[in-house]
Curated annotation (Swiss-Prot):
Annotated compartments: Mitochondrion inner membrane
Enzyme class: translocase
Assembly and oligomerization: Core subunit of respiratory chain NADH dehydrogenase (Complex I) which is composed of 45 different subunits. Interacts with TMEM242.
Family: Belongs to the complex I subunit 2 family.
Record-linked Pfam families: NADH_dehy_S2_C (PF06444), Proton_antipo_M (PF00361)
Transmembrane segments: 1-21, 25-45, 59-79, 96-116, 127-147, 149-169, 178-198, 201-221, 240-260, 274-294, 326-346
InterPro entries tied to this protein: Complex_I_Subunit_2, NADH_DH_su2_C, NADH_UbQ_OxRdtase_chain2, ND/Mrp_TM
PANTHER family per UniProt: NADH-UBIQUINONE OXIDOREDUCTASE CHAIN 2
Single GO term (MF): NADH dehydrogenase (ubiquinone) activity
Protein name as catalogued: NADH-ubiquinone oxidoreductase chain 2
Reactions it catalyzes: a ubiquinone + NADH + 5 H(+)(in) = a ubiquinol + NAD(+) + 4 H(+)(out)
Membrane topology listed for this record: Multi-pass membrane protein
An example Gene Ontology biological process: mitochondrial electron transport, NADH to ubiquinone
Length: 347
């Protein structure tokens, strides 16, 4: 793709998200979503092949349906309240329709079917944008409508997302699909706390984006897309392979890594609000995620796949790929929770 065109597309995508997050008028919110959707489709098709074409078509159809639901919610709200303002409370019917539209855009269950397929059909760099940047705009709308949101609907989708995010990843060997199912589960945790403490949702989103970005960047560094190619990383760069696996465990929420902090805080917040059964079910469902990440760690580091002698000698050669920008991400992705008590010393 022409660099000038690619830069324009990226800027349009960023502008679309910024319009959504900063708008106070529902029509400009819808325009921002459309700009964002139309800009990311060429990014998904960057490597032109039938698989990426299929992925971008699935993404377009899903997002177009979600945009239609969004416009329906805006129209219902306009008819019953006469308001275009984002800051004004939504009517109950408009709130439910808006929540469903945002759930479809985020890939929450039961609207999750497109996420693994689209992520698997694209390059790692496109998958990174899809699972991180594309979550910002819908999450900002959910944050703004959180006072009028339907609690039962939100909690039902959250529980389903956490459970399906765990079950779906159990039998996967493709790393992009594993990351996609992990994303579905993380979205479930974020929406579960949305009605209780919206600010905690933003904290969870920030940690999720940090962990997912680090994991994708390290997979891009090794060109790893399957568990088999990840296991060969152990022969080439053992230290890098160890770091990848630590980040995977952090994504699974294993204490004392960074990924455990938001889950811990969400369970604590829900318990304070006299909700005991919900966080218990969520914690049990999250064990599925942790299980497939631990199985990935075991198969990669504690077992050795058949390989040639030449492959076993690669660790002796220095890697020429730049790693300076990844180092701070690795530290934040693994050590934010252990180091966080030390922040009190700065006060």
């Amino acid at each position: 793709m022409n660099p000038a065109i690619f830069t324009t597309i990226i800027l349009t995508m960023i502008l679309g998200t910024m319009i959504v997050t900063t708008s106070s008028h529902w029509l400009t919110v819808w325009i921002g979503f459309e700009m964002n959707m139309l800009a990311i489709i060429p990014i998904l098709m960057k490597k032109y092949n039938p698989r990426s074409m299929e992925a971008s078509t699935k993404y377009f159809l899903t997002q177009a349906t979600a945009s239609m639901l969004l416009m329906l919610a805006i129209t219902i709200n306009l008819v019953y309240s006469g308001q275009w303002s984002v800051t004004k409370p939504l009517t109950p019917m408009a709130s439910i329709t808006m929540t469903l539209a945002m759930a479809m855009k985020l890939g929450l269950s039961p609207f999750h079917f497109w996420v693994p397929e689209v992520t698997q059909g694209t390059q790692l760099s496109s998958g990174l944008i899809l699972l991180t940047w594309q979550k910002l705009a819908p999450m900002s709308i959910l944050y703004q409508i959180s006072p009028t949101i339907n609690l039962e609907l939100l909690l039902m989708m959250a529980i389903l997302s956490i459970a399906i995010g765990g079950w779906g990843g159990l039998n996967q060997t493709q790393l992009r699909k594993i990351m996609a199912y992990s994303s579905i589960a993380h979205m479930g945790w974020m929406t579960a706390i949305m009605a209780y403490n919206p600010a905690m949702t933003l904290l969870n989103l920030x940690v999720y984006i940090l962990l997912t970005t680090t994991x994708f960047m390290m997979l891009m560094l090794n060109s790893s897309t399957t568990t088999l190619s990840l296991s060969h990383t152990w022969n080439k760069t053992p230290l890098l392979a160890t770091t990848i696996l630590l980040i995977m465990l952090s994504l699974g929420g294993l204490p004392p890594l960074s990924g455990f902090x938001p889950k811990w805080m969400i369970i604590q917040e829900m318990t304070k609000n006299d909700s005991i059964i919900m966080p218990t079910i969520m914690a049990m469902a999250a064990l599925l995620n942790l299980y497939f990440y631990m199985r990935l760690t075991y198969s990669t580091s504690l077992t050795m796949f058949p390989s040639t002698n030449n492959m076993k000698m690669k660790w002796q050669f220095n890697s020429t790929k730049p790693m300076t920008y990844i180092s701070p991400l690795i530290i934040l992705s693994t050590l934010x929770l252990p180091l966080s008590p030390m922040l009190t010393l700065l006060e």
